[in-house]
Amino acid sequence: HQSILFFNGCWGALKAYRALSKRQDIPPLTIGETANMPFIAALSQDGSEILIKGIKEEIAYSAAGDDKAVSAFLHRLAPRVVKTASFASTSLSATNPVIHVTASLFNVTRIENKEDFYFFGDPMTDRVISFMEHCDEERLAVGKALGIRLSPLLEVLNSFWPEKKNTLKEALKENPSYRAVKGPSSTEYRYF
């Protein structure tokens, strides 16, 4: 039995499931995805190493098929692993689309000018945070319309780390794991 696991799925598992479930020539397969990455990491300057900057305490995932191997693997990565009901639930629970896209759009001139900046530092202004909160309200409304109970962005971020924060701004600016994250250097970067 084989498994395919999409980290920070964002609908990747659903696309793979739709494509592969129609095929008759593949062995039994489990397809899963996580709502978010289990760690914060960056590639070294020379591309030879992955630098782990922080490991999250909780990972949410969904899977189609026998998920025992997927669950066991994720339990090796994080102390808390939560299975959600569907790919829609994990994809809509992803924090990166709300955080990364919003902050990148608000800082697009820095990115186009190839400025070297820390993504979760000065760019997280009150206006950026307010816009993220509005985007999060929309995300929660979409989930509700689909019958999916989603957790607010701050609650999700607080589930990742031992130190809980009272505001989204605190959660993004004061987390030591986020401090070393550099901003994108191109509008071709994955945050877009």
Spans of model-derived segments:
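Rossmann-like NAD(P)(H) cofactor-binding subdomain of soluble oxidoreductases
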Residues: 1-44
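Alpha-helical scaffold segments in soluble metabolic enzymes
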Residues: 15, 19, 73, 138-141
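A hydrophobic C-terminal alpha-helical subdomain
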Residues: 106-120, 169-192
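Small-residue-rich helix-loop
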Residues: 125-128, 134-176, 188
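Substrate/ligand-engaging "lid" and interaction regions
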Residues: 38-131, 135
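Conserved aromatic-histidine-acidic binding/catalytic patches
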Residues: 4-8, 123-131, 190-192
